């Protein structure tokens, strides 16, 4: 049951961090949408007339009574908290009771609302947030808030605002974030009374994300939910939706989003954990698609630190970083329980159509049910392993699959071993020498501008090109870069003939890696062809009589 609106006592007001001043069209949208979500709305309509500085937000939430309408625009009036202790167990998006009061100070504000079986009421508020006379109007249960002439009495503030296009882009991002955090809501947004943005509801964020990123398809995603217990013995959940790195990546980190308890937040520490988990799975200078939503006990979070409640202090930060990395590792695996089985990849359909026209085999994408069921059956051009599976077949490029295996072994154990005979390198610069020493190699002077390398990564010890490999390692990069270079040089070369046993061993090792989808450079390792796709290509659903023209 919703509490009535009341003005907070002074001892609670004194503890509340200063609320954010209404400083843009987006700030108005944010405050009104938060109120709508807190009211339990599952349909929100927004109408923006940016040139007229007008915004209207309508919802089908619980609505307000006549008494609430008379109090809602006073400073620190709220139904969401009552006392000091409530500040440490906040479950709503808003709690300070300042939104409507702040808006009334800089715009013309009117609110129409209806609660339960009450009659709908309409009220206009002055710039102090004081209500005028209430009028009865016919309205469905819910609330309609109209804000007009925003900053009309503050022309200097209007002139200092970003361009209208920039403000609209910020509003679009804001609505995207709300939609991801609250997927059950239907969104309809108008600009100057024209359709601008529509988002249909979904069971979770994986059904919302493809509506927001046009280049993203449902089958490009993996999602999972993990229930866990925090170090404080509290129940919590990680909800994760990621773009599979062998299918989708971005030029910038614009779709790495983090939410906590229904609110999008900024956290450089959690973002760093996400980037660490995706390291060496996406190509260089590319970024992952990732939506992370933490559902925590409200006592684990302090929302009362930032005016927009966008920055938080999270208890047990190191624990959460470790759990996030672990969850992403799990989602990046080949376990198909985190991959939708029924959704047909649009790109696969296009490939199948083209293949049928050209009478050639086609390639689709789908993960197996059991990573242990791949069986090596052949090798193509001494480059690709053909692996049979109960649901079709896979093509695996042998070099980059082996590279992934070796890279993860080097990550776990960067082993440097002594050389029986030192390798002599000439003309090394001081920077190259320091780089090899940083990697743990033993180096000694060996005459004029020559150096004796007395140790080497174990994978390179028996290679004939180990001197070239050492020169490559000396040219820079961190330890991870050196591990990638070593794995690449040491992996089975394309053009190498493999026996069935060798191919099977490689498949088994590769399937057990943490990130089997891409090589350390971000290239996809495998392609799959489903038996159902083969059946469609060969028209196996035809009736025998029809196929003979009977």
From Swiss-Prot:
Check the record and name the SMART domains matching this protein: DNA_mis_repair (SM01340), MutL_C (SM00853)
Q: GO CC terms on record?
A: mismatch repair complex
Identify the stretch annotated as signal peptide in this record: none
Recall the GO molecular function terms of this protein's record.
ATP binding; ATP hydrolysis activity; ATP-dependent DNA damage sensor activity; mismatched DNA binding
What keywords would UniProt list here? DNA damage, DNA repair
Output the PROSITE patterns linked to this UniProt entry.
DNA_MISMATCH_REPAIR_1
Q: Which Pfam families match?
A: DNA_mis_repair (PF01119), HATPase_c_3 (PF13589), MutL_C (PF08676)
Keyword DNA damage belongs to the record: yes
The protein's name in its UniProt record: DNA mismatch repair protein MutL
Return the InterPro entries for the record. Answer: DNA_mismatch_repair_CS, DNA_mismatch_repair_MutL, DNA_mismatch_S5_2-like, HATPase_C_sf, MutL/Mlh/PMS, MutL/Mlh/Pms-like, MutL_C, MutL_C_dimsub
Q: What does this protein do?
A: This protein is involved in the repair of mismatches in DNA. It is required for dam-dependent methyl-directed DNA mismatch repair. May act as a 'molecular matchmaker', a protein that promotes the formation of a stable complex between two or more DNA-binding proteins in an ATP-dependent manner without itself being part of a final effector complex.
Q: Name one GO biological process term.
A: mismatch repair
Does this UniProt record's set of keywords contain Phosphoprotein? no
What family classification does the UniProt entry report for this protein? Belongs to the DNA mismatch repair MutL/HexB family.
Native organism is: Microcystis aeruginosa (strain NIES-843 / IAM M-2473)
């Amino acid at each position: 049951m919703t509490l009535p609106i009341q003005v907070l006592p002074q001892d609670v007001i004194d503890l509340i961090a200063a609320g954010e001043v209404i400083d843009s069209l987006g700030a108005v949208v944010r405050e009104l949408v938060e109120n709508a979500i807190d009211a339990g709305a599952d349909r929100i309509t927004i109408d923006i007339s940016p040139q007229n500085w007008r915004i209207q937000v309508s919802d089908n939430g619980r609505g307000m009574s006549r008494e609430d309408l008379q109090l809602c625009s006073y400073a620190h009036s709220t139904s969401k908290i009552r006392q000091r202790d409530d500040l440490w167990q906040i479950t709503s998006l808003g709690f300070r009771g300042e939104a409507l009061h702040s808006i009334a100070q800089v715009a013309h504000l009117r609110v129409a609302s209806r609660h339960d079986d009450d009659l709908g009421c309409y009220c206009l508020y002055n710039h102090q947030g004081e209500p005028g006379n209430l009028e009865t109007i016919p309205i469905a249960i819910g609330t309609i808030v109209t804000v007009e002439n925003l900053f009309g009495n503050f022309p200097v503030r209007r002139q200092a605002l970003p361009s209208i296009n920039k403000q609209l882009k910020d509003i679009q991002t804001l609505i995207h974030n709300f939609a991801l955090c609250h997927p059950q809501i239907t969104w309809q947004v108008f600009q100057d009374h024209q359709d601008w943005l529509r988002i249909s509801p979904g069971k979770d964020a994986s059904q919302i994300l493809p509506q927001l990123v046009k280049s993203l398809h449902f089958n490009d995603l993996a999602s999972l939910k993990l229930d866990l217990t925090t170090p404080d013995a509290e129940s919590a959940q990680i909800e994760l939706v990621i773009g599979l790195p062998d299918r989708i990546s971005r030029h910038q980190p614009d779709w790495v989003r983090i939410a906590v308890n229904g609110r999008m937040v900024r956290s450089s520490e959690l973002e760093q954990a996400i980037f660490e988990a995706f390291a060496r799975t996406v190509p260089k200078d590319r970024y992952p698609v990732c939506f992370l939503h933490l559902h925590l006990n409200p006592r684990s979070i302090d929302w009362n630190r930032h005016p927009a409640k966008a920055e938080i202090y999270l208890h047990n930060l190191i624990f959460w970083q470790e759990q996030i990395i672990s969850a992403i590792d799990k989602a990046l695996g080949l376990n198909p329980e985190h991959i939708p089985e029924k959704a047909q990849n649009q790109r696969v359909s296009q490939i199948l159509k083209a293949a049928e026209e050209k009478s050639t085999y086609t390639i689709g994408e789908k993960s197996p049910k059991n990573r242990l069921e791949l069986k090596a059956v052949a090798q193509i051009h001494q480059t690709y392993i053909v692996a049979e599976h109960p649901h079709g077949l896979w093509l695996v490029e042998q070099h980059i699959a082996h590279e992934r295996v070796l890279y993860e072994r080097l990550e776990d154990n960067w082993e440097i071993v002594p050389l029986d005979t030192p390798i002599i390198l000439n003309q090394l610069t001081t920077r190259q020498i320091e780089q090899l020493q940083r990697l743990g190699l033993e180096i000694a002077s060996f005459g004029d501008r020559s150096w004796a390398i007395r140790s080497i990564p174990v994978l390179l010890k028996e290679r004939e090109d180990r001197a070239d490999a050492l020169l490559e390692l000396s040219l820079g990069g961190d330890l991870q870069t050196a591990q990638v270079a070593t794995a690449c040089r040491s992996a089975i070369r394309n053009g190498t003939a493999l026996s069935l046993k060798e191919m099977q061993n490689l498949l088994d090792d590769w399937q057990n890696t943490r990130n089997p989808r891409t090589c350390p450079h971000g290239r996809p390792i495998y392609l799959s062809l489903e038996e159902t796709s083969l059946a469609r290509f060969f028209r196996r659903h035809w009736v025998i009589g029809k196929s003979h023209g009977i």
